[in-house]
């Protein structure tokens, strides 16, 4: 007699980096293609889109505030799946993110529980020391001390926790009503998990405010706008706000491709030739390289680490020449 088994999960996806011909690319791993030793579940019958979950009232409403951030100095690590720790920390310092966070926290008297993400322990300690009623949590925080800080945070004796690579997965505090990110990331998984801390519903909060100082909203879009789409009979891909393609493309091109094969870094003429190369990072992101002031093109040549993620821009700068 045939047996039918229905699988249900609240975490249908896993994002991983695979090595392809053009370097690391992002892959959406569903329940039907996770194992190399055969699949227990053969078919996906239904996917609940995040938009549906929001409409049904299972997520707290999210509000976003985004600020200008120059991604030009960020460098991908050897895996191609994330930026290097040093370039993340330098960008935080060079763009004065700490002072911006301090000013923002002071403006938000209505927010009762604020979780802040920054790159390093030193930066977290410095920041928390300049914010009233704040504490630091990181991987080296003693277990008992961490438990006490979180307890006082839940009791609203501590208003702000500044964290370094912790409290991103599995941390559940429904009254959390503000998230601030000062940590750059190339990982949609990190962004999804971090914002997810604020999606729990609670009678004492009307929404969760997400304050982005590092360009994550521009790169990935709002988390509640992510959606899954089946590509053919078996493959699924993840897309974001504005139909940005998140998976199935090189990691360094997330935020550049749109659903339907549109590449935002190139403008193609009717005859199929490429008319212009567009900036894919930095303060002139979205502008033709040819319109970038010569002094800034010269600065990029002298300061940017070049790789597959920005090589087209470098080639266009070299073609244009003339930095005067």
What are the functions of these language-model segments?
Residues 1-63:
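Post-DEXD/H (motif II) to motif III coupling segment of the RecA-like Helicase ATP-binding lobe
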Residues 10-15, 52, 68-73, 122, ...:
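Conserved nucleotide-binding/hydrolysis micro-motifs of P-loop NTPases
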Residues 12, 178, 186-208:
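Conserved SF2 helicase motif VI
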Residues 38-115:
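Conserved interdomain linker/interface between the two RecA-like ATPase lobes of SF2 helicase motors
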Residues 46, 50-60, 202-264:
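A conserved SF2-helicase RecA2
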Residues 57, 160-179, 196-200, 286:
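SF2 helicase motor core recognition
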Residues 115, 124-126, 133-168:
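Conserved helicase ATPase core of P-loop NTP-dependent helicases/translocases
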Residues 246-324:
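DEDD superfamily 3′-5′ metal-dependent exonuclease/proofreading module
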């Amino acid at each position: 007699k045939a047996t039918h088994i229905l699988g249900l999960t609240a975490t249908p996806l896993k994002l991983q980096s695979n090595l392809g011909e053009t370097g690391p690319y992002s892959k959406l791993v569903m329940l039907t293609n996770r194992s190399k030793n055969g699949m227990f579940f053969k078919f996906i019958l239904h996917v609940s889109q995040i938009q549906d979950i929001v409409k049904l009232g299972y997520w707290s409403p999210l509000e976003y505030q985004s600020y200008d951030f120059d991604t030009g100095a960020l460098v991908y690590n050897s895996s191609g799946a994330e930026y290097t720790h040093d370039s993340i920390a330098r960008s935080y310092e060079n763009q004065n993110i700490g002072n911006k966070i301090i000013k923002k926290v002071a403006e938000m008297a209505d927010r009762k529980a604020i979780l802040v993400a920054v790159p390093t322990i030193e930066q977290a300690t410095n920041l928390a020391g300049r914010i009233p009623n704040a504490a630091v949590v990181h991987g080296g925080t003693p277990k008992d001390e961490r438990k006490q800080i979180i307890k006082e945070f839940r009791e609203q004796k501590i208003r702000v926790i500044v964290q370094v690579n912790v409290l991103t997965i599995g941390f559940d505090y429904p009254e959390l009503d503000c998230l601030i990110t000062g940590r750059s990331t190339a990982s949609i998984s990190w962004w999804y998990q971090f914002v997810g801390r604020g999606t729990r519903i609670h009678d004492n909060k009307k929404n969760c405010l997400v304050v982005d100082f590092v360009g994550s909203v521009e790169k990935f879009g709002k988390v509640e706008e992510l959606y899954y789409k089946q590509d053919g009979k078996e493959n699924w891909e993840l897309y974001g706000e504005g139909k940005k393609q998140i998976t199935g493309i090189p990691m360094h091109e997330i935020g550049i491709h749109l659903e339907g094969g549109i590449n935002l870094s190139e403008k193609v003429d009717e005859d199929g030739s490429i008319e212009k190369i567009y900036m894919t990072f930095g303060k002139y992101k979205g502008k033709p390289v040819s319109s970038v002031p010569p002094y800034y093109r010269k600065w990029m040549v002298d300061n940017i680490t070049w790789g597959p993620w920005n090589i087209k821009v470098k080639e266009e700068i070299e073609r244009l020449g003339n930095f005067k």
